[in-house]
Every structure is written in C-alpha cells, then in structure tokens.
Amino acid sequence: MSYNHSYQSHASTHRAIPQYNPMAAMTAPAGTFLPGTKVQVGSHRVVVEKYLSEGGFAHVYVVRLPHPVDGNETAVLKRVAVPDKAALANMRTEVETMKKLKGHRHIVKYIDSHASQLRGGGYEVFLLMEFCSGGGLIDFMNTRLQNRLTEPEILKIFSDVAEGVACMHYLKPPLLHRDLKVENVLISRYGGASYYKLCDFGSTAPPRPAATSAAEGRLIEDDVQRHTTLQYRSPEMIDVYRKQPIDEKSDIWALGVLLYKLCYYTTPFEEVGQMAILNASYKFPSYPQFSDRLKMLVGR
C-alpha cells in the first residue's frame, strides 16, 4: 500500500505517460491512457485495457492485474487529478474508508492506491478497486424506463445497499456514508446473480454532535454543502441549527429516499424544496403500484 502522508515528486513517481492517438481521442478525453499503457499502483503494475468514464477530476479505466485478485484478472483504476490539500484529504478519506471496509460483500473492494505530488502543483491519486461487471445502478435503471423495476428487484437492491451501510455503522467508531444515492451503487454479477455494492466514500465521516454555536453551525453547514446531495439530505442536514446531531439516522433517511427513487425514478422532494424535507412532507405517485408494506418501509 503506497497511499500515505509522504508524497513524492511527480518526476520520480509517475510511471505511465499517456500517448496521443487521434482515434482514441474520439471516444476518450485528451490526456487519457491508451490501451496497453502500464501504470504502477502501489505494488500492482497494471495494464490499461480500456477507458471507461469521466467524472469530476477523475478518469476511470478497466485494467488487467499482474496476478488475479479473488479470482479476477481485471480491476478498475480511478485516476484523480487533485488540485489542493483539501481535495487530497477527501481522497485519503475514500482510501482509508475502503481499507476499513475491505472484505464486505456489499462494499466495492479496495485493492491498492498511490499518491504523488505533481511538479506544477497539486497531486495525482491512483485508486485500484474491483471491477463490477454490471456497471452502475443508475445506468441499469435507465435501461428499464419502460419496464420499471419490480418490487422483488427493488427489495433485493435495497437489502444489499442497507447491508453495506450497516457495515459502516457497526464500525467502532461508526462511519456515515453521507452521500447515499443510486449513482453511488455498482452491480457485480456472479454465476447469473446480481449483487449491489456501495462505492464513492469521499464524503464519509464519523457522527457529528449538534452545533453549540453559530460559528460551529456555519462550519457544519459548509461541510454538508460540500459532501452531500440536496435531495437526499435529512432535516438535520437542511437546518443545522435545529440542535440535532448528524448521525446514523441521516444515512437511514437517505436510504428511504433511495428506496423511493428505486420505486418511482424520482426523489420524494424533487419538486417541492427544502421545507418539504424539514416537514417530511411527500406523496406516493399512483403509478407504478407497490404494496403498502413497501410504502411503509419508505416512511420508516
């Protein structure tokens, strides 16, 4: 494991140089690694197989491992351009959280990581993790716009995600994910079965007691703005001055929003704003139809 607090210069640690290829540039942003590029990530020297996606400051690749990990020869490499130390701290949070949760079947598996300081300023982080062959849950949902998810499918997805969250909450001290949403769930497929796994742990944090002053409230408010998604925020995140802690209940609230989204492909507060969140005021659409038991689970 080479993700640590002593960052070396970019000149000595960057072991892969992307080559320019006009054909590759049609499908991938400029500066991405080409297939065949070798990258050293900690103790793993991986070979890029294909460019997968882009998000924020990150490029994501499917790579071939030098030796199988848990029987898998492929993995995912997340290459992140980190502009400053605050963003670097978020990446460190993600890496350290994945290490703590390693081995849980509903958490994307951490393999290795590496960070280096760039000569021109900023940092570059490589994060190597398991390849989830089923892709993202949000992409799967988009293939089912006409034929919506069934109640058994929804309960399976929700159960898997809730298990992953419970694993975080049972740590000592507990950790909150703080950014639970369908976009942060990936799908693994083994032997014809699907397993749903939590990813993106850059927002994780321990529970936080209620603010005791206006200054502390402003700090918490800023932290919430930067690390959470509005539609999934709990009332105590919307109004940090109501003197309630931000704890495991905040994640449980977000799980309810996620369950509603699985059912109706929208969040319960999409159109009605923050007052509706504060008052827990929402309605169930008439279509699709679900059992009263499932609706009660949303409300819990």
Model-inferred region functions:
Residues 169-189:
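Catalytic-loop of the protein kinase fold
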Residues 1-41, 49:
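Juxta-kinase regulatory segment immediately upstream of eukaryotic protein kinase catalytic domains
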Residues 120-136:
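Conserved short submotifs of the Hanks-type protein kinase catalytic core
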Residues 109-123:
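Short beta-strand micro-motifs within the conserved protein kinase catalytic domain, predominantly
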